[in-house]
Amino acid sequence: MTYIENVFVCMAAPLVVALLSLKRGHRAALVFCLAGMGACLLSAYLNTFFARLYQADAVNAATQIAPVVEEIMKLLPLLFFLAVFEPAFARFRLAAVIVAASFATFENICFLTQNGADQILFLLIRGFGTGAMHVVCGNVYGGALRPVWDSRPLRAACLFALLCVAIIYHATYNLLVSAGGTPQLIAYFVPLPTALCFRLLARKAGE
């Protein structure tokens, strides 16, 4: 049995200490790291709760429950940041990527502690695949929001639409991974090129 809250404490402790030693203007990145890991921790509890509530098996939980719960949990700290601080678009986009990357990092570490570290090739493939998938889901809030950033109604509508896109992408990834064999390999391969495409589009847009 893996006590993920203990893993969270071990990872969060040095970040909290670092927060205390930094000036206010330099703390944002660490705060979003903590938010991403906290979202992952809470998602694990919520996934378990809803899986038991709906009596879902492993495949249904991974493809129907986890994508919705995890993408909503990743978006919540971003919505708080947006509502309270009204950040510029570039800062919001950076926050989205940091939350997604720290979420994936915590998830990978929990997977590592639960399954061991003896299969390095599989861990690399899964680490880059799942990590890139979460980063891609964080990146969907990038270029699509820029044209409507100054309009609150359009921004809210786009945020909901992009959340749905992230959920569908996440669910498709989980479905392919659950299928095993060739579909699983495709799932592990696709997110990294997708993340690179996002980067190329951002560079083309001058971000």
What is the predicted role of each segment?
Residues 1-207:
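Hydrophobic alpha-helical segments at protein termini of multi-pass membrane proteins
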